[in-house]
Amino acid sequence: MSTRTESNISESGLDEGLVLVLNCGSSSIKFALYDAAEHPLPKRPMWSGKAVDIGGPNVTYEDTDTPCGPLRTEDDGRRPYVAAIDYIRARVRKRVGQRRLIGVAHRVVHGGPKYSHPVRMDAEVLADLKSYIPLAPLHQPYALEAIAALMEGVPDLPQVACFDTSFHYTMPKVEKQLGLPHEVWDKGLRRYGFHGLSYEYMALSLPELYGDISKGKVIVAHLGSGASLCAMEDLKSQSTTMGFSVLDGLMMGTRPGTLDPGAILFLMESE
């Protein structure tokens, strides 16, 4: 499929083709294809898959139509992550067939203090998001690498970044402020909150399951290797356990959670 075909957008809008969703981690890429022509929009993808152990010796690939097996790409100097994105794009192209791929949506962990809603990607936005890499060094670089690779490979294909931090913009300022001098707020030090896309999905799903009672005061848990809690009222975030970084809050698989700064100072002085 040519670049022009991949990036074709119908004159009637973005509701007649397919949308690819990417969730890029440090060594894995999960992807799903949704039919934008379905109304209401489907909660389950028409096709999905993942590539795992990218950059490692045993990188594997699987999708709805393909059992798990080694992912083999040409050794042509491309970075492993870019090679994996190109491989997935080729598989998507084959799966799309005569349909139109009208856009790509990316999970991006950190939108910083600037981005409170999904945003169409361009060079300026990409530069902004790169500046937030220090705030999420284990997550942010890989989503941006995928975005940059697609910008280069299919420059006319619309890409949209959806942020894990956006859902928590509704928190009162008193919840966002840290116990530090006020001037650090202007430096971006504040409680951002994460797992927002997961919580947004729950906010959309709860009324279907429980009706109007779900619009009251509700505590929602995102539990996995990374974990957090979110307090909602009227289906909007009011408080969350994660703060400035994804290390805060609950104790997790490889993250300490809330930690007394005095403990760190003690270890620095005694070890």
List where the protein language model places each region.
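Conserved active-site "lid/cap" helical segment
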Residues: 55-102, 146-148
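Conserved phosphate-binding catalytic cores of ATP/NTP-utilizing and phosphoryl-transfer enzymes
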Residues: 6-9, 13-15, 142-152, 197-218
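Conserved active-site and cofactor/substrate-binding residues in soluble primary-metabolism enzymes
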Residues: 26, 79-83, 120, 124, ...
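Short glycine-rich, Thr/Ser-proximal phosphate-binding strand/loop in the N-terminal lobe
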Residues: 19-21, 28-78
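Glycine-rich phosphate-binding loop of actin/hexokinase-like ATP-binding domains
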Residues: 167-270
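General beta-strand structural signal in soluble alpha/beta enzymes
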Residues: 106, 137-140, 158-163, 219-221, ...
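Short beta-strand-loop/turn "lid" adjacent to the catalytic site in phosphate-handling enzymes
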Residues: 92-139, 158-160, 167-175
